[in-house]
């Protein structure tokens, strides 16, 4: 196995371990974060990750738009993700992940 790949996989585990310590996050937050980390792993980037709503919903097994929007919005409010939407159908939106919660609100 490639050493770089092992480092990235270790980093994913580190991110998830930190997220799991936050009592404000529930299973829906965690599966969305895991889906984002999975896409980042595929893209070879942990910071700026290109995402689409449909792909995140598929990977996280969230089947309804209200549930997806509720928990994705809360992740933004908590400061775990910074979302930069792309209004162009040919380009994916971008998510920037943070290891620690940037906001104490919520």
Tell me what each language-model feature is:
Residues 40-102:
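Winged helix-turn-helix DNA-binding recognition segment
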């Amino acid at each position: 196995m490639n050493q770089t790949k092992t480092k990235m996989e270790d980093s994913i585990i580190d991110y998830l371990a930190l997220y799991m310590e936050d009592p404000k996050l529930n299973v829906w937050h965690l599966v969305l974060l895991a889906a984002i980390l999975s896409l980042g792993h595929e893209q070879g980037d942990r910071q700026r990750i290109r995402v689409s709503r449909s792909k995140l919903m598929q990977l996280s097994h969230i089947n309804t738009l209200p549930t997806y929007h509720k928990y994705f919005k809360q992740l933004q409010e908590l400061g775990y993700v910074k979302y930069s939407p792309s209004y162009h159908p040919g380009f994916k939106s971008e998510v920037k992940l943070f290891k620690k919660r940037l906001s104490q609100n919520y």
